[in-house]
Amino acid sequence: MINNQTLARPYAKAAFEYASAANGSDAWSGMLGLAAAVVEAPEVAELLRNPRLTRESKVEAVLRLFADDVDEAFRNFIANLGEHDRLFVLPTVREQFEAYKAEAEKTIDVELETAYELSAEQLETLAAALSKRLDRSVNPRQVVNPALIGGLVIRAGDLVVDGSVRGKLSQLAESLKS
């Protein structure tokens, strides 16, 4: 069976290309966020799974919830998704759209898991170093986890760098078991 990532990809790509050409990627990002939130609502998700409703009635119901907050092109996009019975992939379309947007803008979200709260200066220094290393503008988000004991774990996309004391102790324990 085909997964949501595969189903969403052509829609996300088309949406991103359209939004980029129209200089509206931020607006489309917001509209996709709104639409994704709507279809993720339990009541709407149940409605979309109802086999007795036609595709057109599902589109009408979904659009009724946010039609005033989106432009005509976006309403057409939603209608196209509905016509192909793909409204349920909107959250995945949004995720992929954001990935395309981040790639185009050369930005990346980075999670910094630390044992204690970093100062603004430390966070800024770390973000600058990561920005240089990753060749992207970094959007750091700090997560405090005292279980790390010290150091930090950096997560940026597929990259994970564990420089924590807990990580080093785990590596040492593994090497001693060998």
From Swiss-Prot:
NCBIfam families: ATP_synt_delta, PRK05758.2-2. F-type ATPases have 2 components, F(1) - the catalytic core - and F(0) - the membrane proton channel. F(1) has five subunits: alpha(3), beta(3), gamma(1), delta(1), epsilon(1). F(0) has three main subunits: a(1), b(2) and c(10-14). The alpha and beta chains form an alternating ring which encloses part of the gamma chain. F(1) is attached to F(0) by a central stalk formed by the gamma and epsilon chains, while a peripheral stalk is formed by the delta and b chains. This is ATP synthase subunit delta. It is a peripheral membrane protein. It comes from the Bacteria. Gene3D superfamilies: N-terminal domain of the delta subunit of the F1F0-ATP synthase. InterPro entries: ATP_synth_OSCP/delta_N_sf, ATPase_OSCP/dsu. The gene is atpH. Its main location: membrane. It comes from Azotobacter vinelandii (strain DJ / ATCC BAA-1303). Keywords: ATP synthesis, Cell inner membrane, Cell membrane, CF(1), Hydrogen ion transport, Ion transport, Membrane, Transport. Disulfide bonds: none annotated. PANTHER family: ATP SYNTHASE DELTA CHAIN (PTHR11910). F(1)F(0) ATP synthase produces ATP from ADP in the presence of a proton or sodium gradient. F-type ATPases consist of two structural domains, F(1) containing the extramembraneous catalytic core and F(0) containing the membrane proton channel, linked together by a central stalk and a peripheral stalk. During catalysis, ATP synthesis in the catalytic domain of F(1) is coupled via a rotary mechanism of the central stalk subunits to proton translocation. This protein is part of the stalk that links CF(0) to CF(1). It either transmits conformational changes from CF(0) to CF(1) or is implicated in proton conduction.
